[in-house]
A protein has these predicted regions:
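Subset of outer-membrane beta-barrel
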Residues: 1-313
Length: 313
């Protein structure tokens, strides 16, 4: 997934990281278009629906998750469908240990009709007949996979609240399928390490600090962020709040994200700029994102326990 999925929904990468105190239903949708950063479009979309319930000795969540990426002039697509589930065991002092499992399937595909090769240009003239390019044994591949997650939530240490430490691994159950002829694509295990902390400034103001580290064979990503959230009003169970977040993906992108929360609705928009291109970039180099989340049948004891869209990038 594109790293924009991190701040859309943290359960994209750790199904056990949902708020263990939350009871009710959630629905979320996010969309990203990188129309200015690169010459071709790069679109990312996510949809998530979850049921959060309570049993005698534990809390749980169960839902469906759909993610889709499409990029480039060949419409290279990556699609994921998962059934995220987690159980949350309550320990002393309202602390939780959580276990998550997200079985699902990934698909990868290209549109060969949109490919062009050097052989199609002869004497300055283009022909769609002379094709001697790559030979695909298939244009798509489907791979079953599963995300295994472990998360520990510490409710309070001094002014720190909702401290989450998480680890997860994405396992591809059949990674040896041939896609390009005589070549097996490298689908390696993806490990995620997650840290999230709320720091209470006063009754109506707090900071949310996040860090996510990804490791896939020799490749790695480090993403750090901090958000300031101000509660505008708490009146008869209706909460209004605004926030501003600043996030940085190591050696790659800087993201600015304002957000607004009203009762059960959360809305976040963001704009990112490729930091490694700052010297040559114009003001138009970046990508626009929008995230909407809705919660139903909920009761929040306090805002910092409530997970919101601008948590992760």
């Amino acid at each position: 997934l594109h790293f924009s999925a991190f701040h859309f929904l943290n359960t994209n990468f750790n199904s056990a990281s949902s708020n263990p105190n939350f009871i009710g239903y959630t629905a979320a949708a996010g969309y990203r278009n990188q129309y200015r950063t690169v010459p071709v479009n790069y679109n990312t979309a996510s949809i998530n629906v979850n049921k959060h319930g309570k049993l005698k000795f534990l809390n749980y969540n169960l839902g469906i998750q759909f993610n889709s990426d499409k990029a480039g002039d060949v419409s290279y697509s990556r699609t994921e469908f998962f059934i995220p589930a987690a159980i949350h065991y309550k320990l002393l002092s309202n602390n939780f240990i959580s276990f998550g499992l997200s079985p699902g399937i990934k698909s990868f595909s290209v549109d060969q009709t949109k490919m062009t090769f050097d052989e199609q240009y002869q004497n300055g003239t283009y022909s769609n007949v002379n094709i001697n390019g790559e030979n695909f044994s298939r244009l798509s591949v489907y791979i079953p996979s599963s995300l295994i997650s472990l998360n520990y939530t510490l409710s309070k240490i001094g002014k720190f609240r909702n401290i989450q430490l998480g680890i997860s691994r994405m396992i591809l159950l059949d990674k040896n399928k041939e896609w390009v002829k005589n070549s097996i694509p490298s689908f390696n295990r993806l490990n995620n390490f997650l840290l999230s902390i709320d720091y209470i400034l006063n009754e109506n103001n707090f900071l949310r600090i996040n860090s996510l580290f990804q490791k896939q064979k020799v490749q790695s990503n480090l993403i750090n962020g901090i958000s300031y959230i101000h509660v505008l009003n708490r009146n008869q169970g209706i909460t209004k709040a605004i926030g501003i977040g600043l996030f940085y993906r190591q050696k790659d992108a800087i993201i600015i994200q304002p957000s607004f929360m009203f009762d059960n609705y959360e809305l976040a928009v963001s704009y990112d700029v490729n930091s490694n291109k700052f010297k040559n970039a114009t003001n138009l180099r970046g990508a626009f994102e929008i995230c909407i989340r809705y919660k139903l049948n909920t009761f929040f004891e306090r805002l910092p326990l409530k997970k919101s869209c601008p948590v992760f990038i």
